[in-house]
Regions:
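Membrane-anchoring hydrophobic segments
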Residues: 1-175, 213-214, 336, 341-349, ...
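Alpha-helical transmembrane spans of integral membrane proteins, capturing the lipid-embedded, hydrophobic core
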Residues: 39, 105, 178, 197, ...
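Hydrophobic alpha-helical segments of polytopic membrane proteins
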Residues: 61-64, 167-249
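Interfacial segments of alpha-helical transmembrane regions
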Residues: 94-98, 218-222, 273
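Small-residue-enriched transmembrane helix-hairpin modules in multi-pass membrane proteins
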Residues: 129-144, 228-342
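Active-site beta-strand/loop microenvironment that shapes enzyme catalytic pockets
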Residues: 180-188, 193-194, 200-202, 318-346
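Short helix-coil transition sites and intra-membrane helix breaks within transmembrane domains
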Residues: 191, 310-311, 401-402
């Protein structure tokens, strides 16, 4: 595909983002985020120096069409005439209970982290050893087990504290809860949890008008520097010391994360293969069935590396849906996700605190589409979040009857 055509499609998506923002008079609408993200990724791929493969025209057209399906579904979700007038929401007794569970469980979680790190005593760094232990896929693979449920509990406790706060940001217990959640995220070692927590907090604050968009932009720039480069160097993923090439190495790694997924997906999309018919999309429930003793095939969560020409094993959000059901499946699921995001956002704007929290959480898989699928691959995690959040609030209609 020519550079001019690639830029045209990318700029079309940027224009679509502006159009949705003007139509809905809302720059935070999920349709704006979706079209803007893929438009900017396309522009970056076209104009920044890199050694990745050229993107095929069919891949760019597929991304453009799927994004349009997402946007259309998001802007037609629900009605702006819906109202919550006369309805109030109150936090339940689960709100403080989650806080105390997270607080009291943290020492046990930290003890388990130390125990896991000792099984991979390859370096002098606790975090590197812990990361190795948690990411091995051989017979020596280890996990937090049931203690892993403490992480979503800590996250929900923090997000509910923010949503319910009468202060500008967190109240006192909320700040403590935030520190606890960050501790859990650090002990989980993956950037996934740090980014998930930050993105959810940021968009909850935006929806509730606790911060201004420009404040978020500046804060995000600082957070990316700390979250990506700082944590990456902590677990030895980017950089090699603090010499003169460290910054360049980190920037190269950042470019690899940002653009290599698109190149890898294009390579897979251009290679004919038999469809998997749900093995990727339904991996989470299949894994649960396997854990319950059923003899079923579970595809590995970590994908094989391909060379584009740099080695990478990230393939954008689109891989499982195309692998399972080709382009019709991708269009269907993108429309489904767009509908979900649009509905959550509308209800969040109308004041439903449950949807405020859930929308904040849902922005994470939306903004990580350039990287990999975080929708159905984390299905069990989203179910846990949804149940906990819903139980943290009680809806009281005008009549006074609880619902």
């Amino acid at each position: 595909m020519t550079l001019a055509m690639q830029l045209f499609l990318a700029l079309s998506l940027v224009a679509l983002a502006f159009g949705v923002g003007l139509y809905r008079r809302d720059s935070l609408h999920p349709g704006v985020l979706q079209a803007g993200q893929w438009g900017l990724i396309g522009i970056a791929y076209a104009v920044t120096p890199h050694s990745f493969r050229d993107i095929d025209a069919s891949t760019s057209m597929l991304i453009t069409t799927a994004t349009a399906a997402f946007v259309l579904a998001s802007i037609t979700a629900g009605s702006r005439r819906q109202s919550t007038v006369g309805t109030s929401y109150h936090s339940t007794a689960l709100r403080p209970l989650l806080f105390w569970i997270a607080l009291l469980g943290l020492p046990v979680f930290a003890w388990r982290a130390q125990e896991l790190a000792s099984t991979a005593d390859f370096t002098e760094s606790f975090f590197i050893n812990l990361r190795i232990a948690l990411t091995r896929e051989d017979d020596e693979a280890v996990t937090y087990g049931a203690l892993g449920y403490l992480l979503p509990i800590a996250f929900v406790a923090t997000l509910v504290e923010l949503t319910s706060s009468n202060a500008r940001f967190f109240e006192r217990r909320g700040w403590v809860s935030l520190a606890i959640a960050i501790a859990y995220a650090m002990l989980a070692t993956g950037r996934t949890f740090i980014f998930l927590l930050f993105i959810a907090i940021a968009f909850i604050a935006l929806v509730q008008r606790r911060v201004r968009p420009m404040q978020l932009v500046l804060g995000s720039a600082a957070f990316v520097g700390v979250g990506f480069f700082g944590l990456g160097m902590l677990v030895n993923k980017v950089g090699d010391g603090m010499d003169n090439t460290a910054a360049l190495t980190a920037l190269d790694a950042f470019a690899l994360y940002l653009l290599s997924g698109l190149a890898a997906f294009d390579l897979v999309h251009a290679t004919p293969a038999a469809l998997d018919w749900g093995l990727n999309v339904l991996r989470s429930p299949i894994a649960v069935a396997r854990a319950l003793g059923f003899d079923v095939q579970v595809l590995p969560l970590v994908k094989d590396y391909v060379f584009v020409p740099e080695p990478t094993n990230i393939y954008t959000v689109m891989l499982p849906y195309v692998r399972d059901f080709s382009w019709p499946g991708l269009l269907f699921f993108f429309a489904l996700f767009g509908r979900m995001h649009g509905s959550l956002y509308l209800r969040a704007k109308l004041g439903d605190p449950r949807c405020v929290v859930l929308y904040g959480l849902s922005v994470y898989p939306l903004l990580m589409q350039f990287f990999q699928d975080q929708y159905l691959s984390l299905l069990t995690t989203w179910v846990q979040f949804g149940v906990l959040v819903w139980l943290c609030f009680r809806r009281t209609p005008a009549s006074g009857a609880a619902a």
